[in-house]
Amino acid sequence: MYSFRRLALLLALSLPAMTVALAQSSSSSSNPAAPAQAQQPAGQSQGQISVQARIKARREQRRSAAIHEAYNHLYEAYVSGGYLRFQPGPGVPAMGSAPAGPALQRANIYAWDTGLTRFYSERLGVTVDGRGYFATAYVYNNQYNITNPAISEYAGLIGPTYRFYMQPKYSVSGRVMGGFIHGKFSGDLGSFKPAQFGLWPDGNTFAASVSIPVEYNLTPNIGVRVVPEYFLSGFGSTTQNSLGFTLGVSYRFGQQ
């Protein structure tokens, strides 16, 4: 009986110690799971970033390939129609006791324009351009009964072209050209002189053009282009500053 009491006393004293030990063991076994759970969202986030980076890289590769396909051509030919506001002459000068006539109004000139660009890279090329301008110039009422004579001009230009913005479907370029222009202002005047009507004299002079060609690609080889332009000419030992545009189609061919 005495032994049984001693055994019961030992069990009663050891029970709290066993409870504490089990609690500590449970706590230590559960702690490593917390970092593992914390690391799992970080791993998922890095995986999502990696997938997005791959998608972005593939998209950029496709874009670069499309740009290369559209602009890696050796030549680009174009044909356009155009419009220009041009000063056809200074007006009738003073002669003897007769006063000078009024300055002539600007004429609405319609044009054809064709050219070829040889590219040395996807961006830089040299353009050779030929164009013709046609209009009637209003020279006011006069004693000759000629009020709207036909005038024409023909120009040849050359200069650099640079594509400063390229996308698979469109591009924007800058172009500067210089050359000569021939003016024919006496076509409808018979034996009269252009100066009698205030027009520029027939002849050749310098010409220059500054323009911004904008092209929209229908295919990698064919595009539609609009070209706003500043055009400078030098008839009559003066300068004519004209603004206009051309609208047409382009065809790219050959491989660099």
Question: For the regions a protein language model found, what residue spans apply to each?
Answer:
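Gram-negative (and chloroplast) outer-membrane scaffold detector with strong preference
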Residues: 76, 117-118, 122-193
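Transmembrane beta-strands of outer-membrane beta-barrel pores
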Residues: 81-87, 130-136, 178-184, 230-234, ...
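Residue-level signature of outer-membrane beta-barrel architecture
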Residues: 81-83, 118, 162-164, 214-216, ...
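Repeated loop/turn-to-beta-strand initiation elements of outer-membrane beta-barrel proteins
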Residues: 123-128, 167-170, 216-224, 255-256
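Outer-membrane beta-barrel "beta-signal"
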Residues: 241-256
